[in-house]
Amino acid sequence: ESFNGRSFSITEKIEGETIARKILRDTTWDLARENFILDSAKALAAIHRLEESHFPKVNLETTSNPLNSLEAIYDALDDPHPTFELAFRWLKKNRPKPTGISFVHGDYRLGNLLFSDNGLKAVLDWEIAHFGDPCEDLGWMCVRAWRFGGDGSVAGISDYETLLESYRRESGRTISIATLKWWEIFGTLRWGVICLQMGGDFRTERTRSLEIAAIGRRVAENEDDLLIALEEQGI
């Protein structure tokens, strides 16, 4: 019986740490950082193997063309940003072949991962899980915002090559760096549009949350990240 009229699940309580800046900097988490890529490759390969039959009571969206879906959301905001439009043009022109349709977490990144001192313990925040291209999760890990100031291209910890090789071994999928970079740029644009959307919600008083207002101010950060990423691609 639902206590609030909505579906919910009860999960086991697991002790650990989620704060990204601690994971990236504190010596307590040295081993967790060392194991991060292999742990993530195993976790994502397992997530991407899940099938619709595993969720008989959940209506999960299938996103076969996420770029078009994101552009529709952006257009509906009616708040033009030239950097975002440049990114949309580049993404359309350089779109890679689809990897396939898999179960996708949708927000796999530091901050949504629970660590013990020796590695990954749990993956949190499943509310935007859906079926789509598994590369979406890999690219999202690489978005500059989710590096939290770390030096590595992947979550501030590691590099593209190590991630792709570890994921290949665990999943059997071979993904090129060019494809991963496309999904990273898509993820950066997606986060920028989300920030734009949240800022609009605050300005139009659909919400008065200061947290939402603060996220809305991060549009400029994402524009800067997009310009850096596009310059690396020769734009």
What residues fall within each predicted segment?
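Active-site acidic catalytic loop and adjacent metal/ATP-binding pocket
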Residues: I47, R89-C142
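All-alpha amphipathic helical-bundle segments outside canonical DNA-binding/catalytic cores
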Residues: V58, T174-F186
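Conserved protein kinase catalytic core
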Residues: T18, F55, L113, F131-D133, ...
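Active-site activation/catalytic loop segments of kinase-like enzymes and analogous catalytic loops
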Residues: E136-R173, F186-E205
